[in-house]
Amino acid sequence: MILTTTHTVQGREIREYKGIVCGEVVIGAHLGKDILASFTNLVGGRSNAYESTLRETRDGAIAEMIEEAQRLRADAIVGVKFDYSVIGQGGSMMMVAVSGTAVTLA
């Protein structure tokens, strides 16, 4: 499956627009990671625990979107866009959403 943030696939012609596809994953905050992230923020640097979780969450959202495009028999997803939102009471959860347009290529 070809994924691109652009609205075209270089060197290929879009034959048919199949529709909007998306994937969403919500993760909850974890006390251990929060403590580690707080310590990292105090001493400077990056929080590997949060970055790893965010990467896994983003990959899960992409996988959901690809599954939806495959059900539509698409060859590619164009105009891919990511959105990150803090949700839940007190901002206790984060949602990663990805969307794009499923297309077939000539």
UniProtKB/Swiss-Prot annotation:
It holds the Pfam family YbjQ_1. It comes from the Bacteria. Coiled coil: none annotated. InterPro entries: UPF0145_dom_sf, UPF0145_YbjQ-like. Belongs to the UPF0145 family. HAMAP family: UPF0145. This is UPF0145 protein HNE_1325. It comes from Hyphomonas neptunium (strain ATCC 15444).
